[in-house]
C-alpha cells in the first residue's frame, strides 16, 4: 500500500465563509478517506492573522493556499473545491515521479507556467477590484451631478417667473431685485456643490439642522404659485400647529417638496385639487403626504419610478414621465434615514409619502446623516 504524501494547506476564511456550500464540501473531502494525501490543514481567520494577507499577497478571501510541496499555489473565488479537485491528480503524479527519481523537464516548464498563470490571475484580480472601485466612484459622481443639475432648474425658473411678473406689473422692481438676489445666492451654493462633486461623498453635501417643515412646504407652494393659479388648481394643506421640528437639510427638503408638488401639478387636471398633509407619525418620524387626482401609476411601475434613469412612458395629453426628480427625492430622503413610497391606483391618482426624523437635540456638529 502506497504511503500518502503530505499536503500542507492554509485556508484563510472568515467564520461566515465556512458555512458556504463549496467550503463545506472542501473540508468534508479533506477529512475523508477519499483524499489521497496526508492533509495538514490550518484554518486562519483574517482578522486574527492579518499578516497572512500580506505574506501571501491575498487580494480576495476565502482563499486556499498550498504551502507544500512547492511551488506555492493559491485558489480563491466561489469554486475553491472544484479548483482543488482539478489539481490533486497532477500533484499526485508529480509526487510519484519524484519518488522514482525521474527529472521531467515538462514538469519544470509546467511549474514555471503555473507560477506565471498565478501571477497573471493575481494581477487580473487587482485590476477587477480597481475597476469596480472606479466604476462605483463614477456612478456616485454622476448621481451628484444629476442632482445638482436638476436642482439648478428651481432658482432659474423662479427668477424667470419673477421677471415675467415684473413686466406684467404684478410685482415692483424692489420685489424683483429681492427674488433675483435670493436665487443668485442659491445658484452660488449649487456651484460650490458642483466643484465638490469630484472630491466628496454624497452625504457630505448635506447640512442637517433643526428646521420647520411647515415653513418649507409653505415656501414651496408659494414658489409654484404661478403654475397652480394659472390652471386653477387648489392646494389644501393639513399641518398641525404642534408639529415638531425635524432634523434635516433645509435646501434638500425644499427640493423634495418642490419635486413632489411639481409632479402632482404635472399630473393634475385643470381645476383639480392637491392635498399636502404633515403628520407626527411617531416620536421619531414626521410623515409627509402629497396627493393628486391624476392618472395614477401602475403597480408594476411603483418601485421603478424611484430608480436612477427611469422615466415612465407618456401618460396623458403629452405629459411625460417622472424622470430624474423621484430618484433624487429617494436619495435625499434615504440619506436622512427616512423612506419614500407611493400609493396609487390607475385612474384614481397618487399619494407620495416620505418620512423625516424628528429633531431630538441631535449633535449639530454631525458631519453627515446615516443612510437608512
From Swiss-Prot:
- Enumerate the CDD domains for this protein: HATPase, HisKA
Alphabetized, the UniProt keywords read:
ATP-binding, Biological rhythms, Kinase, Nucleotide-binding, Phosphoprotein, Transferase, Two-component regulatory system
PROSITE patterns per the UniProt record, alphabetical: HIS_KIN (PS50109)
GO BP field: circadian rhythm
Name the enzyme group at the top EC level: transferase
- Phosphohistidine: residues bearing it: 150
Histidine kinase domain span: 147-360
The GO terms describing molecular function are: ATP binding; phosphorelay sensor kinase activity
Domain of life, per UniProt, equals Bacteria
**InterPro entries (UniProt xref):** HATPase_C_sf, His_kinase_dom, HisK_dim/P_dom, HisK_dim/P_sf, KaiB_domain, Kinase_SasA, Sig_transdc_His_kin-like_C, Thioredoxin-like_sf
Pfam families tied to this protein:
HATPase_c (PF02518), HisKA (PF00512), KaiB (PF07689)
Write the Enzyme Commission number(s) for this entry: 2.7.13.3
Catalytic function, reaction form: ATP + protein L-histidine = ADP + protein N-phospho-L-histidine
According to its record, what is known about the domains? The N-terminus interacts with KaiC, while the C-terminal histidine kinase domain autophosphorylates and is probably responsible for self-oligomerization. The N-terminal domain stimulates the C-terminus to autophosphorylate.
Assembly description: Homooligomerizes. Interacts with KaiC. Participates in the KaiBC complex, whose core is composed of a KaiC homohexamer and 6 KaiB.
Instruction: Tell me which HAMAP family the record gives.
Output: Kinase_SasA
**PANTHER family recorded:** HYBRID SIGNAL TRANSDUCTION HISTIDINE KINASE C (PTHR43547:SF2), TWO-COMPONENT HISTIDINE KINASE (PTHR43547)
Q: What is the recorded function of this protein according to its Swiss-Prot or TrEMBL entry?
A: Member of the two-component regulatory system SasA/RpaA involved in genome-wide circadian gene expression. One of several clock output pathways. Participates in the Kai clock protein complex, the main circadian regulator in cyanobacteria, via its interaction with KaiC. KaiC enhances the autophosphorylation activity of SasA, which then transfers its phosphate group to RpaA to activate it. In addition to its output function, recruits fold-shifted KaiB (KaiB(fs)) to KaiC to cooperatively form the KaiB(6):KaiC(6) complex (independent of SasA kinase activity).
Q: What is this protein called?
A: Adaptive-response sensory-kinase SasA
The gene from which this protein is expressed is sasA
Amino acid at each position: 500500500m502506497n504511503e500518502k504524501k503530505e499536503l500542507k494547506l492554509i485556508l484563510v476564511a472568515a467564520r461566515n465563509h465556512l458555512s458556504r456550500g463549496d467550503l463545506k464540501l472542501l473540508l468534508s473531502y479533506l477529512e475523508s478517506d477519499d483524499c489521497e494525501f496526508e492533509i495538514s490543514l490550518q484554518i486562519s481567520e483574517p482578522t486574527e492573522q492579518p499578516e497572512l494577507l500580506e505574506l501571501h499577497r491575498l487580494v480576495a478571501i476565502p482563499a486556499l493556499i498550498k504551502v507544500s510541496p512547492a511551488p506555492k499555489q493559491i485558489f480563491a473565488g466561489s469554486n475553491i473545491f472544484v479548483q482543488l479537485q482539478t489539481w490533486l491528480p497532477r500533484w499526485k503524479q508529480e509526487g510519484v515521479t519524484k519518488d522514482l527519481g525521474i527529472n521531467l523537464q515538462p514538469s519544470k516548464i509546467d511549474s514555471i507556467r503555473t507560477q506565471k498563470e498565478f501571477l497573471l490571475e493575481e494581477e487580473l484580480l487587482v485590476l477587477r477590484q480597481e475597476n469596480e472601485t472606479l466604476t462605483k466612484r463614477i456612478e456616485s459622481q454622476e448621481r451628484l451631478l444629476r442632482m445638482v443639475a436638476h436642482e439648478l432648474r428651481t432658482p432659474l425658473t423662479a427668477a424667470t417667473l419673477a421677471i415675467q411678473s415684473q413686466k406684467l406689473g404684478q410685482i415692483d422692481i424692489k420685489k424683483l431685485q429681492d427674488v433675483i438676489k435670493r436665487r443668485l445666492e442659491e445658484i452660488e451654493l449649487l456651484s460650490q456643490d458642483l466643484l465638490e462633486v469630484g472630491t466628496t461623498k454624497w452625504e457630505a453635501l448635506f447640512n442637517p439642522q433643526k428646521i420647520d417643515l411647515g415653513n418649507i412646504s409653505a415656501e414651496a407652494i408659494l414658489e409654484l404659485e404661478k403654475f397652480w393659479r394659472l390652471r386653477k388648481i387648489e392646494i389644501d394643506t393639513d399641518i398641525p400647529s404642534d408639529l415638531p421640528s425635524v432634523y434635516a437639510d433645509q435646501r434638500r427638503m425644499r427640493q423634495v417638496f418642490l419635486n413632489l408638488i411639481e409632479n402632482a401639478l404635472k399630473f393634475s387636471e385643470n381645476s383639480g385639487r392637491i392635498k399636502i398633509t404633515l403628520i407626527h407619525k411617531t416620536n421619531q418620524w414626521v410623515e409627509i403626504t402629497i396627493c393628486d387626482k391624476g392618472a395614477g401609476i401602475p403597480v408594476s411601475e411603483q418601485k421603478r419610478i424611484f430608480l436612477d434613469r427611469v422615466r415612465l412612458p407618456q401618460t396623458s395629453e403629452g405629459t411625460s414621465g417622472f424622470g430624474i426628480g423621484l430618484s433624487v427625492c429617494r436619495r435625499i430622503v434615504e440619506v436622512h434615514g427616512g423612506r419614500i413610497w407611493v400609493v396609487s391606483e390607475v385612474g384614481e391618482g397618487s399619494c407620495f409619502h416620505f418620512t423625516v426624523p424628528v429633531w431630538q437635540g441631535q449633535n449639530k456638529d454631525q458631519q453627515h446623516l446615516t443612510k437608512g
